[in-house]
Amino acid sequence: MSSPASAYLFSGLKVLDFASFIAGPAAATVLSDFGAEVVKVEPPGAGDPHRYLYRTPPNPALKENYTWQLTNRNKRSLALDLKNPKSSEILKRLVGWADVLVTNFPPRVRRRLKLTYEDVFPFNPRLIYADITGYGELGPEADKPGFDITAFWARSGLMQFTRDASSPPAVPVPGIGDHATAISLYAAIVTALYRRERTGEGCCVSTSLIANGAWATAAWLQAALFGAKFSGEIDRKNPPNALTASYRTSDNRWVLILFVEEDKNWPVFVKAIERADLQGDPRFADSKSRHANAAALVAELDRLFASQPLANWTALLDAASLPYGVVQIPEEIVKDPQLFANRIVVPINDGSANPRYTVDSPFMLKEQPKVAPGVAPELGQHTDQILKELGFDADQIDDLRAFGAVPHVPHSEASL
């Protein structure tokens, strides 16, 4: 059963989502999860390019637009050509209506569209203007296009730090850096809203993919800043530490052991696997010896883990209360009971008797309800409705269509 609108934390908060792809729109999605009203503004014709990203390999194949549903639930869509001079009055009224504006246009594009903070602030001095860039607002690359994989993963060094010495850098799952950056922008917006409560004034907040990539890799980036010596790429066959590594089981699965408290965990592990010979081996007698002989220990553990299936190893490691993780496959992830017990995945409110599920935003407030995820909008689905709410009458809307500021009909994604 859904809660009344007034029960949500951000009921009455109005958000304009001018952003594209994932990071900016996902920040607006988190606001919508707590009751904010979000209007997604898209160019007529193709709309947000993220509408079609799911069709691009190596994304999993499905006719239904799963990525769009995830990032744009609980939003209304307004198709608006910001390049059209007739759109200026619509933009002015939208900004006057809004509490928050989210964009990820590069600075030069914002200037061209008259969508900078300085352009829109006079329309609404209480506006929270939130922007994301690839490489930051300043510097020689401020206008450089940036994506999750290029600015968050590659530029920050994450790709280098996580790759195996025998392999080139792996292309990660799309959106990992975007979703991390979205939470940063959400935090910035909420901080600015708190400031507005105290001062009555709006402000501009920003973050970038490269900043969040640097924050994600900060433990080792800080080491570099202090002049630490790096051992080079991690070689799985000869790592710095064989007890923080992944091992293949007899049924071709992978289990990651993470014995951070090595001197405490090692004797427990050796006892659990009934390998007293390893305990007595001088090569593995203490942490210093194990690190010096990591390649030999990897060879021993490779043979050991390859001797039994995954289920045997999880039972043994659980019984010994040792820290480990199973490298899950998609079929397991979507059935993981922890995801359902903690409402990490939640049903989509689409009126179906057999609801499908989506990933919820990654935090909750006790005794504070979240909005049930609704179906993401078609391009321009709510254009007329929103224009009427802004005070445009039928004749004015017809004129806007005649001049091309808004499309004549909503677009169906399937027709594009």
Q: Residue ranges of each PLM-predicted region?
A:
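Substrate-binding/catalytic subdomain of NAD(P)-dependent oxidoreductase enzymes
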Residues: 193-234
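Aromatic-enriched alpha-helical interface/lid elements that frame and gate functional surfaces
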Residues: 243-320, 324
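A short glycine-threonine-serine/GTX helix/turn-capping micro-motif
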Residues: 170-180, 202-204, 234-244, 255-256, ...
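A glycine-rich dinucleotide-binding beta-alpha-beta segment and adjacent secondary-structure elements
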Residues: 319-373
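Mid-domain beta-loop-alpha active-site segment that forms a flexible
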Residues: 175-190, 209-217, 261, 265
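N-terminal helix-loop segment corresponding to the beta1-alpha1 unit
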Residues: 1-201, 348, 378, 384-416
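Short, well-structured beta-strand/strand-turn elements
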Residues: 38-41, 318-332, 393-398
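Short Gly/Pro-enriched turn/cap motifs at secondary-structure boundaries
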Residues: 68, 234-239, 245-246, 353-356, ...
